[in-house]
Amino acid sequence: MKKALAWTLTLLVTTCLWAQNTSPEPIFPIVQGFGGIFDAPHATEKPDPTLEYKVVIDVATGDQNKSEPFMSLINLARLINLHAMGGVPKENIHVVAVMHKDAMWAVLSQEAYRKKFGVDNPHIPLFQELKRHGVKLFVCSQSLYKREVPFEQVMPEVEVATSMLTTMTTYQLKGYAALKF
């Protein structure tokens, strides 16, 4: 009897511990399929839904795995989704991203990306979804020149900027908060 009770208690405790450790499913309040986040009902520090959020992001980091979207670019979607989860209306979230250094490879057209890396460009659906939600996407022309990438190889969702430096300073002077990914 004691053995059966001990096994039952062990099973019950193990099941309860397992249930506590399972993660909830990510949610996608605005940007669908990218930048999944977890509801944080217990958070005490939250975005102010009455503010207009203007953010310019210096995106420099790429990843080794060229068949998956770069985490730095997934974070663009996370930023938007987190603010939305915090109650900020979509029309009060303004995001500008300028890619350079290793992140600039993400902006290649399907054909150019496949030729360079041997796989389809996984960033195209992400950029299409970001553009659909008003994100302005730029690539630094200086990074393109330095890596000898013709402007014609940039996907249509991304515009060419004079440079990351001038884009960052211009938007900061327009009141955008600066982040670096």
Question: Which role does the model predict for each range below?
Answer:
Residues 1-21:
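Bacterial Sec-dependent N-terminal signal peptides
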Residues 20, 27, 113-114, 119-181:
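A cross-taxonomic marker for long C-terminal extensions/tails that follow the last structured domain
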Residues 20-41:
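Long, contiguous juxta-domain segments that are non-catalytic but functionally important
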Residues 48-66, 108-111:
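Acidic/histidine-rich, surface-exposed loop or edge segments in extracytoplasmic proteins
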Residues 54-58, 95-99, 136-139, 180:
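Structural recognition of the beta-strand scaffold that forms the well-ordered cores
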Residues 65-72, 120, 161:
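Solvent-exposed, acidic/flexible segments
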Residues 69-88:
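Histidine-anchored nucleotide/phosphate-binding helix
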Residues 89-107:
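Acidic helix-start/capping segments at beta-turn-to-alpha-helix junctions
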